[in-house]
Amino acid sequence: MIEKIQKFLKLEAAGGILLLIAALLAMLCANSVFSPYYFEFLQTQVAVKLGAFSIDKPLLMWINDGFMAVFFILVGMEVKRELLEGSLSSYQKAIFPAFAAIGGMVVPALIYWFINRDYPEYQQGWAIPMATDIAFALGIVALLSKQVPATLKVFLLALAIIDDIGAIIVIALFFSNELSMLALIIASIAIMILITMNRYKVTGIIHYVIVGTILWASVLKSGVHATLAGVIIGFCIPLRGKKGETPLHDLEHTLAPWCAFAILPLFAFSNAGVSLAGMSLAKLTSPLPLGITLGLLIGKPVGVFSFCYLAVRAGLAKLPEGINFKQVFAIAVLCGIGFTMSVFIAGLSFGEEHPDETILALSRLGILIGTSIAAIVGYILLKKTTNKPLVQAG
């Protein structure tokens, strides 16, 4: 189990470095002579037609709705694996990170809402600071991998996975457009076929690719966000086949490097480019970016740590062996690294088809500022709290 986690951490750490490079390249492109070409390239229309059926969207939307759906297949498989036989497979294992994740979602959302309570045009962005970027957070942990306890890494993984579940629920409930009943019926049929394939332990991945593609296209047309199709597909991949095959593990092993080294960096490059033209200190400290930044920097650590501490004091959960509350707080600060998921939710919050570019730019700047500070402070705290054995608190 520990060996699998170590391999996963190494992969995610390398992916985190690529994410950072992609984000920096995006900022350079958006604020240089290449700026017109960068934004024009992302708005290039790409159409796919099959008889009467067609999807015609800008390249940016293909990346956000299409490639990110593949990433969410991986998320779905990771969540399923952890629920069935991993760090969330029992009440005792799941309850401590569950309290952490709930606090890390509720408090940032409340801080954002409080700061933007008098600005109705910004209020739909309340979910932006709720997210944690697992690749970046694990990348920071990997820099100190030799001195960070394995239990602490497992805690962060479990917390991030529950955080992903929360993000999936939020996307499903709050970011759906006008619904198409025909598309929903087709999607429902595709889901039933996937569930049947799972029940009969069909292990041929090509079958899931075909039905999954139909599900993705119908969900896209239905008004529900298309990435949710990815989660459903991931959940329907069997953990084991009739003859002992491991289709979920095999597909996870195949998709993980593609997501870490291609899809997420491409998403970062496409979404992190923010033009700083016309930006001022007054704009950067306006309610929208301020709410996001403080939600990530204050809301995340306060929410994660306080919910963990209170749960332990109330006897509802136990502090995992080998870690202490100082280390939990360091991890809580790292949870303020919201980058990819926060940027993704910002795009959903402020419109995909006809977004307000000024609002999107301000929200992305708030995310980048909050993420950067959380990464630096989290690294310092984690290094300080894990540089020598500490007596467990609690």
Swiss-Prot record:
Pfam families associated with the record: Na_H_antiport_1
Compartment(s): Cell inner membrane
InterPro entries registered for this protein in UniProt: Na/H_antiporter_dom_sf, NhaA
Keywords on record: Antiport, Cell inner membrane, Cell membrane, Ion transport, Membrane, Sodium, Sodium transport, Transmembrane, Transmembrane helix, Transport
GO cellular component: plasma membrane
Gene Ontology MF, one: sodium:proton antiporter activity
Catalyzed reactions: Na(+)(in) + 2 H(+)(out) = Na(+)(out) + 2 H(+)(in)
GO BP field: regulation of pH
Transmembrane residue ranges: 14-34, 59-79, 95-115, 125-145, 155-175, 177-197, 204-224, 258-278, 292-312, 328-348, 362-382
Membrane topology (UniProt): Multi-pass membrane protein
Keyword set includes Transmembrane: yes
Keyword set includes Nuclease: no
Job of this protein: Na(+)/H(+) antiporter that extrudes sodium in exchange for external protons.
Family: Belongs to the NhaA Na(+)/H(+) (TC 2.A.33) antiporter family.
PANTHER family: NA(+)_H(+) ANTIPORTER NHAA (PTHR30341:SF0), SODIUM ION/PROTON ANTIPORTER NHAA-RELATED (PTHR30341)
HAMAP family: NhaA
Protein name: Na(+)/H(+) antiporter NhaA
Organism the protein comes from: Haemophilus ducreyi (strain 35000HP / ATCC 700724)
Upper taxonomic lineage: Bacteria, Pseudomonadati, Pseudomonadota, Gammaproteobacteria, Pasteurellales
